[in-house]
Swiss-Prot record:
Family per similarity comment: Belongs to the terpene synthase family.
Pfam families: Terpene_synth, Terpene_synth_C
Cofactor note: Binds 3 Mg(2+) ions per subunit.
Residues that bind Mg(2+) 2: 597, 601
Lineage, top ranks: Eukaryota, Viridiplantae, Streptophyta, Embryophyta, Tracheophyta
Motif (DDXXD motif) on chain: 597-601
UniProt organism field: Zea mays (Maize)
GO molecular function: lyase activity; magnesium ion binding; terpene synthase activity
Name of protein: Dolabradiene synthase KSL4, chloroplastic
Length: 848
């Protein structure tokens, strides 16, 4: 019966290739005093089967709060690692201070929204009260005059209007025509109008035939033809524009309107793009349904300005007044957006591995969001799918008590199809809803079940038809669908997001906008932190390799002693520099637990098994027992010495001795393995799942791998907490997930070996059906995973502090990833590649 273990491999040279589209970034040597070299170019390769008999993993942790390292090193061989760790963390602090001086979090406010020429033009067209011959906002007219490009276009920052097939080409066309209409409305900027019309005329005819519809502003097919008709009515002569061209645009609009008329969500979308419809829309009716408390229509300045022009809407005017007062002479394409901006920033910091450096800022942002969630007073959050789903996910995962009822309005597929998001084929909204739906903590959260079902279906449809929105990377959609959040290793996720980070990546509404202020700062900070961590990991791996050799573990010919494969998952989840000692101990215990498992499973005689059990039972009095073989002596002394080392280090953190608990965990493990060995020798089959799991949970070996390192991560872990029911339940549900996931993967092999397995044990109650038995086992896994997640995020009345609960959840994530039934990490090549990406391979980051 398998326990959790990693197989490792030996190093060989690897040459990193530089592609034309990527730059290989290496760590700055100045960050590290002891290691000024770049991350090693050595990679891990193997001719061995990484999981020769069983797949199991060492424990891993992601502690969001900075865990204190109070224990001094007690081994001289670790001093260099300790110093490297301190210097690496100091570098992060220095960089963080520099970024704070540059207001890195400015992008998380509405002040960080860039100007939208398109929306500014519509605001500029609003007439003054009582005098329709002058503009209400002359400063917006001035801004238009001052911000025309040399080619005659207007458009979002970073865009190019040279050709309509460029990513922001249609945006430039729509923005330019809107600015021309605004200037013509007030007979201003004759030369600007001429140049703008020239740009539109030279580029718009090919617009119908070229470019990807995903690059078009939302509503382009309705709004641009509508503005074109208005320009003609105003007597504007557009160069190169023939009647055939005009007819083509009218057909484009008619086709879009006919498409919308066939859907139940057409009213919302037609109101959103109403500036392209003019007097055709019933503005009073639209105001009754879609005007928000702040006076806006959909938080869109352009739509709201059109309502003020066509409907004499006082609330719309007050919204526009406040908007111009806030932003000055230009306006953004959406306002307010502060809630989304804050949540987007928190999410980005987490995905890039930077959240530890901004704990107080993140807490402040989430506290603000939670207050709004409870008060239900934030229209931006409650009405916008992306914002609402992201708020739910981040709040729940950070321990805030939020109900899935907040997403009930999005429970059906029609809620998406009938919305502006659905009409715009908004991938981001779908993706956020899908990610939120995975954070299910009770079986009866059917809202999340329903959302997960239809959002996954639509995301797959978008991938299959190549309709993923430009604001979302298609690879991100594929990754999220393939790997649920409970199967991810944090450092691999950080690397992926850093490398795929879209500097200048834009969100497309009626005009493109982006959170531009944080791009370079975020990537720079993330790259430096990742590379300094890699240098530390390499030092730790070198130490562990030396330790295994000095402990003579390689003399155990039956054992899988593979430092790299046992270390890398710990680095991937327990990635923080200050957790160095916990990473090292966890890796040691995983190697030792693997060796113990191999002794009981394939390598040891009955005498050796019983001898090891007796030695661990006697512990400090082991000399009275003696060693029946050199192999048992090597293994016991490694366990004993490592445990004493842990106890000495833990004393400085816990202010008490933990050696009795440590010895107890090892004793429980070998007794359980001895029981399984006796079952196998006697051909005994447990009479029930309860009898089987009572032994099998313990024999999976997560006690030494997970529980012991908890003493090193801080804060204090009192004896009363270790013995409390909550702690035992956390351990139980983690063990259930690990053991049963392993059983699903190994039942065929163990059936041939005559060993018992939960799948084989359950099958008889289903008439011998293996598939039915597997379904029952999967349901048990799902129930334990759900309960473990509930215990992680439930802060009320929690006895076990969050950093320790996080450890149990991280191990649950690890076993889910490595025991996925589609064998995503079952091949040596894939596992080696993942290990290299965490420990050795430098980042390949897109140029900013």
């Amino acid at each position: 019966m398998a326990s959790l273990s990693f197989a490792s491999s030996h190093a060989s040279l690897f040459c990193c290739q530089q592609s034309s589209s990527a730059i290989i970034l290496r760590p700055a040597g100045a960050l590290l005093r002891l290691s000024r070299r770049q991350p090693s170019s050595h990679t891990i390769s193997t001719t061995d089967q990484l999981f020769p008999r069983r797949s199991r993993m060492p424990r891993n942790v992601d502690t969001h709060a900075a865990a204190e390292r109070n224990s001094p090193s007690t081994m001289s061989s670790l001093e260099a690692v300790d110093e490297l760790e301190t210097n690496g963390d100091s570098a992060v602090v220095v960089v963080r201070e520099q970024q704070q001086q540059q207001h890195l979090l400015m992008g998380a406010t509405d002040d960080g929204l860039p100007p939208s020429p398109y929306d500014t033009a519509w605001v500029a067209m609003v007439p003054a009260p009582g005098n329709p011959l002058v503009p209400r906002f002359p400063q917006c007219v001035d801004w238009i005059l001052q911000n025309q490009r040399s080619d005659g276009s207007w458009g979002p920052d970073g865009g190019s209007g040279d050709h309509p097939s460029s990513p922001l080409g249609k945006d430039a066309l729509m923005s330019t025509l809107a600015c021309v209409l605004a200037l013509k409305t007030w007979d201003a900027g004759e030369e600007h109008v001429r140049k703008g019309l020239s740009f539109v005329g030279n580029n718009s005819p090919s617009c119908v035939m070229t470019g990807d519809e995903r690059d078009a502003p939302v509503g382009f097919s309705v709004i641009f033809p509508g503005m074109l008709a208005r320009a003609i009515d105003m007597g504007l002569d557009i160069p190169m524009m023939t009647q055939a061209n005009v007819d083509a645009f009218i057909r484009l609009r008619d086709t879009e309107l006919n498409r919308m008329a066939a859907t139940t969500g057409s009213k919302a979308f037609m109101s959103y793009v109403a500036e392209g419809l003019g007097d055709v829309l019933d503005w009073d009716e639209a105001a009754m349904v879609y005007q928000r408390q702040n006076g806006s229509f959909f938080n869109s300045p352009a739509t709201t300005a059109a309502a003020a022009i066509h409907g004499n809407n006082d609330r719309a005017l007050r919204y526009l007044d406040s908007l111009v007062n806030m932003f000055g002479s230009s306006v953004p394409t959406v306002y307010p957006r502060s809630t989304y901006s804050r949540l987007h920033m928190v999410d980005t910091l987490q995905k890039m591995g930077l959240s530890r450096s901004f704990v107080s800022e993140i807490n402040e942002m989430l506290d603000m969001t939670y207050r709004s969630w409870l008060a239900n007073d934030d229209e931006e959050m409650m009405l916008d799918m992306s914002t609402c789903a992201m708020a739910f996910r981040l709040l729940r995962m950070h321990g805030y008590d939020v109900s899935s009822d907040g997403l009930a309005q999005f429970s059906s597929e029609s809620s998406f199809r009938d919305s502006v998001h659905g009409q715009a084929n908004d991938t981001e909204a779908l993706l956020e809803l899908y990610k939120a739906s995975q954070i299910q903590i009770t079986e009866d959260e059917l809202v999340l079940v329903d959302i997960r079902s239809w959002s996954a279906k639509l995301l797959k449809e978008q991938l299959g038809s190549d309709k993923v929105s430009r604001s979302v990377d298609a690879q991100e959609v594929q990754q999220v669908l393939k790997f649920p959040f409970y199967t991810t290793l944090d450092r691999l996720e950080h690397r992926r997001h850093i490398e795929q980070f879209k500097a200048g990546g834009f969100h497309m509404l009626k005009s493109a906008y982006r959170f531009c202020k944080e791009d370079e700062e975020l990537v720079s900070l993330a790259v430096q932190g990742f590379h300094s961590s890699q240098a530390l990991y390499q030092q730790e791996l070198q130490f562990l390799t030396r330790w295994a050799k000095e402990a003579r573990l390689h003399d155990l010919e039956f054992a899988r002693i593979m430092p790299m494969n046992t270390f890398f998952p710990n680095a991937a989840l327990m990635y923080a520099p200050e957790l160095s000692e916990a990473r090292i101990l966890c890796t040691k215990n995983c190697m030792l637990a693997t060796a113990v498992d191999d002794l009981f499973d394939v390598g040891g005689s009955r005498e050796e098994m019983e001898n090891l059990v007796r030695l661990i039972d006697m512990w400090d009095e082991h000399e009275e027992v003696g060693f029946c073989s050199e192999r048992v002596e090597i293994l016991f002394r490694a366990i004993y010495d490592t445990s004493k080392e842990l106890a000495a280090k833990a004393m400085a953190v816990q202010n008490r001795s933990v050696i009795n608990h440590v010895a107890e965990l090892w004793a429980d493990l070998v007794r359980a393995m001895m029981t399984e060995a006796e079952w196998s020798m006697r051909g005994h089959v447990p009479s029930s799942m309860e009898e089987y799991m009572q032994v099998a949970e313990t024999s999976f070996a997560l006690g030494p791998i997970v529980l012991m390192p908890l003493y090193l991560i801080g804060p204090e872990l009192p004896e009363a907490v270790v013995r409390c029911p909550e702690y035992k339940q956390l351990f139980h549900h983690m063990n259930v997930c690990g053991r049963l996931l392993n059983d699903l993967q190994s039942y065929e092999r163990e059936a041939k070996q005559g060993k018992i397995n939960s799948v084989l044990l359950v099958a008889p109650r289903h008439g011998g059906s293996i598939e039915a038995a597997k379904s029952e086992v999967r349901r048990a896994i799902e129930a334990s995973r759900r309960e473990l997640l509930r215990m992680l995020v439930a802060e009320a009345d929690a006895t076990v502090p969050r950093p320790f609960r996080q450890e149990f959840w991280n191990m649950c994530k690890m076993v889910h990833l490595f025991y996925m039934e589609d064998d995503c990490y079952s091949s040596p090549k894939e596992l080696v590649h993942a290990a290299n990406m965490v420990v050795f391979d430098p980042l390949r980051v897109r140029e900013l």
